């Protein structure tokens, strides 16, 4: 447990210090002259801290970089699961949004009139005039971009998280616990890691009655569900790159359904997958994936990738070991 403790301490300390010291002032306007786009980049930089936590832990404990869970096991076996990681989140988000709009049909707006009007107002504020048809085409063009390009374009930052969570923490914890508690506990940890951002409105806003605890709890639930999906593709490929692609796909498509919402929806409900109905397809698939992982574990066929070395072993010990 030593390396797990060091990883979590470093990752949480660096992330929360950065978010309280830099992200909070930037988001509140205390740091003047920072445009909104720059604020997004400042916030996104926090995604690198889990990877830094892995680096510090591996170096400080002389673990080295054996079993880094980056190289896939084989193209033929891995490729289908990379495809699941790439396209699965968009498909599940669409299904969840469809369920939401079936439950709340009055919120469905196929013409995207709310977003069209908002975009036209923003353009008018800069002295430009955009026809509604042009804006509609611009908005629709974002969807194939989110499906086909966002997963790989986002991988630079999502790998920063996934090398830490699916590439280190989950496999480490799984050596001490069975797969079900491993994924429940690590999912909650991942959700709590987001807590400072959740407090200032990430995913769930700030104007709800149970702020901020309700948002933190909802984020933990979302992270448990998504964490199961990302762990599953990691197990099937042997590489946390699959999780990084899946994470990038989720981030790229998470807000797509809002284009078709009259009201903007409710983040706790839908149509975004962070809501209980918008995320219903994710929940169902995650339940099947968790059941399959549990079944494989009972049968002794769960091939969980190994991260690094056992707590009582260093790379120097391996070097001294007799060669067979």
Predicted regions and their residues:
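Residue-level signature of the transmembrane alpha-helical core
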Residues: 8-12, 48, 86-87, 147, ...
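Alpha-helical transmembrane segments in multi-pass membrane proteins
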Residues: 19-62, 78-90, 97, 103, ...
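Transmembrane alpha-helix/helix-exit interface in multi-pass inner-membrane proteins
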Residues: 94-110, 161-162, 181-202
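Membrane-interface helix/loop boundary segments of multi-pass membrane proteins
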Residues: 159-192, 235-239
